[in-house]
Amino acid sequence: MGSFSIWHWLIVLVVVALLFGGRGRLSGIMGDAAKGIRAFRDGLKGESEQAEDETAKPLPKERDKDSARG
C-alpha cells in the first residue's frame, strides 16, 4: 500500500504532460478562462449601465392647463 505501481506513475505522467506539455497549455487555458470572466463582468456592467440610463431619463415637462389656454 505504501508503494506506487506503474499505473500510478503513468497516470501522474499523463496529468503532468497535459498540464505543462506543449506550448504552455496551462497558461493558455488560464488565459482563456480570464478572458471569459472579463467578458462576463463587462457584460454585467453593460447591462447595469443600460438599466441606469433607462431609469435616469428626465421626464418631459408638462404644460399647465392654464398656460396652454393661452
Curated annotation (Swiss-Prot):
Its main location: membrane. It comes from the Bacteria. GO terms for cellular component: TAT protein transport complex. It is found in: Cell inner membrane. The keyword Transport applies. GO terms for biological process: protein transport by the Tat complex. Keywords: Cell inner membrane, Cell membrane, Membrane, Protein transport, Translocation, Transmembrane, Transmembrane helix, Transport. Belongs to the TatA/E family. The Tat system comprises two distinct complexes: a TatABC complex, containing multiple copies of TatA, TatB and TatC subunits, and a separate TatA complex, containing only TatA subunits. Substrates initially bind to the TatABC complex, which probably triggers association of the separate TatA complex to form the active translocon. This is Sec-independent protein translocase protein TatA. The gene is tatA.
